[in-house]
Regions:
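Bacterial N-terminal signal peptides that target proteins for export
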Residues: 1-7
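Hydrophobic h-region of N-terminal signal peptides that target proteins for export
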Residues: 10-19
Length: 233
């Protein structure tokens, strides 16, 4: 398992005039994390796994951050640890991996999206999209909204309630899309995480049509319970 949080989405890109035989399905992941936030592997290693396992698209959506700028981390004291670094170095080599020891501390630089995208994307078969998990909350309830193909990082917007918090974050995404012309879309992640979001909260939203039905993290409660609907319902 590449990260603690794994979502696999498959969808068909087909016009309404196409027959069922003409429909083509594309498989990808829009919600996964790297060492840029709380994931346990390097972005290139994550992209390499998906590319090598028949996926067509990937968006690494770290919490409230884009993979840009200088970011050096402790080589051993991170979620992946020395084992992840050893695999990373073996796969990509010293010519690619930036690492050094500063005052006795082993450090490694996380590659930016602008650096790893040209190396890992394959035109026509494997698409990489810059993404962010906009991670907000209301009174301790986690409200996380994925933004796929984002252009500029968006900070959490806050709000006066669960639905209001979601709406303000969605509005920020839609405003960026309109201002930049960049194709992008938001979707609600793991609504049952922390029992934070009710169906009535999502029904009220404007400009939002998608939510995450399945998430592989053990705490997201995909299947609900006696008092809460499953995400499939």
């Amino acid at each position: 398992m590449i990260t603690k949080t794994l979502l696999t989405i498959a969808f068909a890109l087909a016009a309404t005039t196409l027959s069922a035989e003409d429909t083509r399905w594309w498989k990808g992941n829009l919600h996964t994390h790297s060492l840029w936030s709380d994931g346990d592997d390097y972005p290139e290693m994550i992209a390499d796994w998906y590319r090598s396992n028949g996926y067509h698209f990937l968006g690494i959506s770290d919490h409230n951050v884009l993979a840009e700028g200088q970011r050096w981390i402790h080589r051993e004291k991170n979620a992946g640890g020395q084992r992840a670094f050893d695999k990373y170095l073996k796969r990509f080599g010293d010519d690619w991996v930036d690492h050094k020891v500063v005052k006795g501390v082993p450090r490694v630089r996380l590659k930016t999206y602008a650096e790893y995208r040209p190396k890992m994307a394959v035109p026509g078969s494997f698409l990489l999209m810059q993404s962010e998990e906009l991670s907000d909350q209301f009174q301790g309830r986690p409200i996380h909204i994925n933004v796929t193909n984002i252009k500029k990082q968006i900070p959490p917007q806050g709000g006066a309630g669960v639905a209001a918090t979601m709406q303000k974050n969605i509005d920020a995404v839609l405003a960026q899309r309109k201002a930049t012309g960049q194709p992008m879309f938001p979707h609600i992640n793991h609504p049952n995480f922390g029992w934070a979001i009710q169906p009535a909260d999502m029904i009220r939203l404007r400009g939002e049509r998608f939510f995450e039905v399945y998430n592989g993290h053990p705490a997201v409660r995909n299947y609900g319970d006696s008092k809460h609907l499953s995400t499939g319902q």
